[in-house]
Regions:
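Helix-coil-helix junctions within alpha-helical repeat/solenoid scaffolds
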Residues: 1, 15-304, 341, 363
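Flexible inter-repeat linkers and adjacent short helices
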Residues: 1-8
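Helix-turn-helix DNA-binding segment
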Residues: 248, 287-290, 296-363
Length: 363
């Protein structure tokens, strides 16, 4: 892709988004890594910020929450300075990551403090509003969530049949409608998103819609839908969505009195959520697992075991004496992202130098 155009070309990021929309997530990741590296090498700040945003969306789709948050922040830092409308997309992506980590109060403050008018692009408006609707749902403010998804529906009314990968608003609106006591509308919205996901052959969106449909069902119908969602999502790169599906199935099995299988499903979801860095999701699953009679091992808050897979990889490279710049080149992230990971590593390991890091990692 970069053979014909540099990272500053007008279509490179659009091409990566197209790969993501089609479910070709790994190809999108590889292309985004190359674009980020090219932009960094050229010192092209705007191109770097835009490419970081695209990669944040890919990381988020894959469930790699910490990496998505770091790239979204890098994009927000760069795009916010240029009044680029995509700064709102970066902001919403950052908020989505905070939701996954259970940082709901901080996420709400970030949205409120931004004080930015909605962007002139309807699709960006819809993405921001959908994110705010998710936040309101997690905070159990159903009326506010209804208002946000209603605004999204008004924006996209004339879009026609659109691939739901990037904006799965119907299934979220369906869950909210169900909680608001409107089962007919709930079934209609989620059913339409399932149809569109099958039409465009996008398994991640299909799996998400199935899981959300199960939230509106009961008994064996819900359990069957969740098993189907797991089968669909297991064939994709969407690890966090798969974690949610396993957790939902475990919750349903517990309520059906099938506690042994419930614990097994919840254990799978817990492991996946931990690997994704989705600490808020992990905490919810841990609570459900305890209710099912399980004794989940407490998450390590300090020490090597507390490091996420990405943090461990960065720590191992740093312990080899590789500089932050060198780590950035090897892991295809920015130096700021490496510095952010290093701060987390030092905090979790209670150290202040790389010499101490070498001892801990080797032990």
């Amino acid at each position: 892709m970069l053979a014909d155009q540099s990272s500053q070309g007008p279509v490179v990021n659009l091409a990566v988004l197209a790969l993501l929309q089609c479910g070709r997530v790994i190809e999108a990741q590889e292309a985004a890594d190359a674009i980020v590296c090219d932009a960094r090498g050229r010192g092209a700040q705007l191109a770097y910020a835009e490419a970081s945003l695209i990669r944040a969306l890919i990381f988020y789709t894959r469930g790699r929450v910490n990496e998505a948050a770091a790239d979204a922040q890098a994009a927000l830092d760069g795009l916010g300075q240029s009044d680029n409308p995509h700064a709102q997309t970066a902001l919403a992506t950052r908020v989505n990551c905070m939701i996954e980590r259970g940082e709901l109060t901080e996420a709400e403050s970030l949205l409120n403090d931004a004080q930015s008018p909605l962007a002139p692009t309807p699709a960006i408006d819809a993405y921001v509003l959908l994110t705010r609707g998710r936040l309101h749902l997690h905070r159990k403010d159903i009326d506010a969530a209804l208002e946000d998804v209603g605004a999204v529906e008004n924006i996209v009314r004339d879009f026609g049949e659109v691939n739901p990968t990037m904006l799965p608003w119907r299934s979220l609106a369906g869950v909210i409608a169900h909680l608001a006591g409107d089962p007919v509308r709930s079934r209609s919205l989620i059913g339409e998103e399932i149809r569109l996901a099958q039409l465009f052959e996008v398994p991640i969106a299909f799996g998400v819609a199935l899981r959300r449909r199960a939230l509106t069902e009961t008994g064996q119908h819900a359990l069957g839908t969740l098993r189907e969602a797991i089968t669909v999502l297991a064939s994709t790169e969407a690890s966090l969505e798969l974690a949610r599906a396993h957790a939902s199935l475990g919750r349903g099995l517990r309520r059906a009195g099938q506690r042994v299988e419930a614990r097994a499903q919840l254990g799978i979801g817990l492991d996946l959520a931990h690997r994704c860095g989705a600490t808020g999701v992990e905490a919810d699953i841990r609570e459900e697992l305890a209710a099912a009679g399980g004794r989940p091992r407490r998450s390590a808050l300090t020490g090597v075991e507390s490091l996420t897979p990405t943090e461990l990889r960065v720590a191992q490279l740093a312990a080899q004496g590789i500089s932050n710049s060198g780590i950035a080149e090897q892991t295809f992230v920015s130096r700021n992202t490496v510095a952010w990971h290093m701060r987390n590593i030092y905090r979790k390991l209670a150290i202040e130098s790389r010499e101490q890091l070498l001892t801990l990692i080797n032990d």
